[in-house]
């Protein structure tokens, strides 16, 4: 599309103007629609999406050029018309609902128009007028005379299907008979399907570790005097309430039950507030040369520390109960584990505060974490509080999201390890981490300030807040002598103020409801050879280098020179597998896929893994969970098979950087191997943020289906080495026009130019389907065909009708997913000015026009009314286009044969070489035309009414069918909360009458608005996505929170209704 620097904000020599929000502007917007847009709107909706996108870009360029040449009137006209294209014409166009790479261009164009800050008033005015237009269109049937409904999608009643579900397979040939007899259910049955609601969440639903007491005992946690051990339980979040403190209490520990018995209500906590999960270290950060730091006898001890760290937490209300007490706060050593720049501008106020830079925990020379506490003590030797840390009753450390996103290793665990294993300064208490970190502390203080009227500045140091600046100015006025010169005054005002003295006000007893818990039962000692623990199942062979923790030095008395690194690695692998060799390991699969399905822990065997929400990343987490459940897609990246399809280095030296595919593979491997844990997708998010900084990860909420399109588009570009893809997926290059019931010549022309010409990839084999759009003139029988591909099928939700209940009350009927598909594929009869301007018999056609001449007719809008340069589709203009992922800019040129812009770059290099439409419209006399007239019989049809039938058919459907329900209106501020009933088994009929049968395995739900809403997902984690009762395994994923959901359908309940369902994932199955 456009270059990155286009836009008035990036052109210092362009002086933008800002139209006022006025009645005059409103009249200008309305006049342009009624005098110009309205006349062309019906015809423009029938144009190819790619042509509309190119013309919208042209209008934006015309707007910039008019501003540059000081023509504000022309600039305003071009911008208003461009807005109508972006927010009205394109979303209502014929090909918009089939989402392919062209959709990514549309989203970027939309952002360019919205990012013109000086034209914000114009955008608001246009959106308001579009709302009026669409409301009128709904009242008058959108110009559609009537619909011819075709039952292209259906599901069968439960009684007919329950006996067939078990026979479904993923391996046999597709059935040919769709058998419509008895397949449509009654409305009463649809209304009786259960309405799904999110399950109630409990404390243990937040994943910590995949450890079951009966499977993995923990001898390292036994107290010396005890004869029996208490199994380690996953730690839980504590109640988000302040703690009680009574002045006559002498001990906190005497009032507390054991820490492991404290429970909490997860529903009152927030998914974003927890840092308490598994931190993964990218294997790329650890050199294989440092593998000799591992010791096979130390694995059990490291896992013990890992468990203890996850249990050693303190909530923000509990820390507040300590810091608000004049006696207990002196017993706390608070460690700010953040980069110094962050600590300098804000931190928790405490009498004994130490800032430890996480970068100090990494040895840059050896590229490993430091493993001796005396190294850290030497670096912090001037800090008396840290040196005397063993004299404190409480040691609490905290971090924040920005530091976590900056540091690439698990600094929290390294710090915990150094503190707990220190021989020089043994601690009397276990260090605890502040649950939720700085962000949770800040949120808690704001809550208390509103409820209890505490002063935030007494507990939070923020020198640049408004209140702090006022206090600073008052202190300077009181302390500054009159004789001080102005230079000194200016210098002192620029310094960062010192933290306030510790004098918090006394708080009412009602604010302190519970004292903090004592440390966990006991602290493991550091033996020479610690007791062994059964390890988590590790990756076989090549993938075994992925480690959950940085290397920790060995303490076994073995000389390093006696063993080389290969021997140590071999011993380590033998030790890791000795407990599971006969139970778990199977013959090695192709591409070294690790095998864990036989684990007795269901969370491990099914790889049920939570994902950390680092701010507003729930839209990414929910989509990743569904993609991870798509077996074909998951295997491609877990097996590393994807590497054989990466783009080779180019002759000119430039090449694709396969960052996204590599980071997705690493993320999938972590999720696969760490069932029962919550994984932090830091590396993956960093790559996405690098490729698409406009998404503003992790701060802004985005549309999850737009993220899916970005992900699939990029993966397609990276995995498009044509030679290897063609060898492994020859089906992508082959087709049988007769079997597909398509016109051989027209389809072949489109297929060669757009499918093969644009490049193929494994993503196409999994997600790509094909559509046929046709326009048939009922007056002369002339028909034009247009083909396109899609990754996501975006469906509008039909308007709900009212029905009377048995009690005589009117209720809104639910909408079936099959109805959404059938409305999408139904034939539309267009008449009057909404009819297609047939090039043979339409208003602009010449009676003497021959059929041969018509076949070369360019696809542009024509009308009796004279058009200005704003409305002619500029698809042949030579110009530059934006490479969305930094691959460079290319020039387009015209083909000699048609009016469509052709690009010489490879498929993955050009955003305009999309799966949009054919290079030219194919035309023929339709075989089912009733008239069958040609130009020689023009007198026979000249007196007939001009009527057009618009038809959409599925030519092919993908292995994984992704359906997006379009719940948000054009301006994304309103949401359609209609209850949609969706089936577990879905049948869709192709154009050739073959029936494709699909099985539901994933759902993305959305609650709230697009800006302030929340995404969750439902996934059938059964390895074969079985829907039989007792075998289906539906799990509800809310970031790190995971819960089994037994209400989400089975072979006895094949339909589910929900007002939150947003994206559905279906997998093709065969009888």
Swiss-Prot record:
Pfam families: UCH
Primary location recorded for the protein, binned into one broad class: cytoplasm
Record field: compositional bias (Pro residues): 497-507, 516-532
Keyword Membrane: no
Gene Ontology CC terms: cytoplasm; cytosol; nucleus
Comment field (misc): Present with 606 molecules/cell in log phase SD medium.
Name this polypeptide is given: Ubiquitin carboxyl-terminal hydrolase 7
Organism: Saccharomyces cerevisiae (strain ATCC 204508 / S288c) (Baker's yeast)
Gene: UBP7
